[in-house]
A protein has these predicted regions:
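Basic, polyanion-binding surface patches
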Residues: 2-182
């Protein structure tokens, strides 16, 4: 069954839906890419904050995320045919908010240290982990896209200056860290 096979028999406020979904904690990622040279200034880094990231398959290794339809950042990712998912640490809430705002992608990267993944996509320094992918498929799902990526390379930062990294989480409209007990 597909979305087009169903009839929307449940009408409710989208704000209420968002509030209820906010009770489910999610990890915070910044998805990045190097947008191809489209204006003669050379490839440009693009990226946005994504909370809807998930693993999809182990064999083959696939991941997915859901950006909003109409995102100019997504246009750059689609044009590059690759992306890197950066799992943010609890010390990177400023980066989360910076990349969550609409605007010029280049400004998002000012004063943010990064280096290139094998695909050329930016790996943000001090991220908990990064996953470099090629775009496998893109599907429209309501007001969002589902982007499926095939994992080409990945790694985790096992040590932030002698301390294990703590991932950043989003829960009920706020950001915080998570440390496993034991």
């Amino acid at each position: 069954m597909t979305m087009s096979d169903t009839t929307d028999s449940t009408a409710f406020d989208s704000g209420h839906f968002r509030t209820i979904m906010g009770h489910f904690p999610t990890g915070v990622t910044v998805v990045t890419a190097m947008s191809p040279d489209i204006d003669g200034t050379g490839p440009q880094p693009v990226g946005f904050t994504i909370g809807s990231f998930t693993s999809v398959s182990l064999d083959p290794p696939l991941v997915g995320f859901l950006p909003q339809v109409g995102s100019s950042t997504m246009d750059g990712i689609e044009a590059s045919s690759s992306f890197c998912v950066n799992v943010l640490s609890d010390q990177q809430s400023d980066i989360c908010w910076r990349f969550a705002k609409s605007g010029v992608d280049g400004a998002r990267f000012s004063d943010v240290d990064w280096h290139a993944a094998p695909s050329g996509s930016p790996i943000l320094d001090r991220a908990v982990a990064w996953i470099d992918c090629s775009v496998e498929a893109i599907h429209t799902m309501g007001d969002h896209l589902f982007v499926l990526g095939r994992v080409g390379a990945l790694d985790a930062d096992a040590d932030h200056d002698g301390e294990p990294p703590v991932p950043l989480l989003f829960f009920k409209g706020s950001l915080g860290g998570f440390e496993a007990a034991g």
